[in-house]
């Protein structure tokens, strides 16, 4: 079906050809599932959820989901794709303790309860929960999706319910597996994508068994989508993925050894890439990254030190630090003026984007920053450094994972601008796991990390990042842990603004209408920015995308984002095609 692409300006292409890409690890064959982005329901380039593999879907009261398959759809090996593949996954896999020891995936649970699953026909299935399940549809559309179906005709031969015991035992021994469940799990991993025998619904099918230096993917002869002329996609016949050292990928991309590459390229590779375009016949597009902020400061609101905890929980202090941050300078010096000097918030590509909110307390205003610090009562001491109420100097150690010179350069600029507000900054590089554990235990004052994972949110997506819902949130890890463990660990939220965010998150989970969800999202984003729970430094940093100059339907401008977006996935590589020259098509 071509319905997903109407109005997206995709040109009719020509079939054939090979695309070359590079990866650094053999396990990255899974990126072809990301890029291929065939999903039951998927995001289009405008981040609207639409039926893809499914013919259609219907949602009632936010809790009853009816999925309709396409008549005659087949797996890549020619087996029929029907609701039997859903039934098999649900009854014989997800609810089999040997295959799923912890039970079905968490996205299938609402308040601890599983859905009622009804097979209506070979092409229609219904999942019904007692209460709304807002995570279900977005989970199906993720870059790494929730799989609620499996190729049953292929997998039944590895399941004791359908296979003779002696024959199954022979296969377990031949594959050197511990038991039938281990064998079944090895054969079935649609996302891992390392079994050439496993049928798929993706546009390209892996042909090469690991280990290998080159993996070949060929077009799926039963792929479901066609262009507006009725021609079956994908246009490209084969994708060749070579495995090379990651540090060599920029050089290889810049010497014409790839036809499409984003992974392992960094913004600082851009000048080298640009200067080689004409010689090697490629173009370098600059897409925006999709995180809320390229780099973000996380004041630890759960720090053990009471004086610092009180300060970090004072919104005036957080606002003062944000106002003392010279984002324009950071943008010019580190990002050549090409970033967006806003806070850690949604991006212009999000349908919920609010420019005024995104730039709240993001302007450089050292006078107001100092006024707020004076108002709090932090008096200037010797050397122009402010003093805490207990007499200690206002010195903040910002801990980093020490993984990039980008962080070092940015933190030096912050050191200089915060000093003008009487705040002294020190930088402490740590190993990633050490940093996380120090944050979790309340030792870290402030950490630097990337911002919101999803800066391109739409109302259907979970706003969990904006509320204390996970220990991984570096500004309030103990509050997040408390929710995750149902109070068994961590600390209960005791800051009113954070409590309000949590209440709104729970309200979003049971909201039945799109408009209600959009209103909650807008309120949560506004509060998140106004309260400056995190201090975003720069957004919309640029990601170089190298493409063969003959490659068509790849947009010159786009967002390079994991989820939503699946990197290239939402721009539909199955529609990419190679023209005969650089100028035609």
Segments and roles (model prediction):
Residues 2-61, 91:
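N-terminal lobe/hinge region of extracytoplasmic solute-binding protein
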Residues 11-12, 16-25, 64-67, 89, ...:
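Short, well-ordered beta-strand elements
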Residues 55-100, 126, 136, 252, ...:
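Aromatic- and charge-enriched surface segment that lines or borders ligand/interaction sites
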Residues 69-77, 113-115, 202-205, 239-240, ...:
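Second-shell loop/turn segments in exported
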Residues 70, 191-195, 217, 222-274, ...:
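Ligand-site clamp/hinge motif
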Residues 93, 97-101, 117-118, 205-216, ...:
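Extracellular/periplasmic solute-recognition and catalytic clefts
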Residues 105-184:
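Surface-exposed binding/hinge segments that line
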Residues 198, 204, 208-215, 219, ...:
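Detector for C-terminal structural segments
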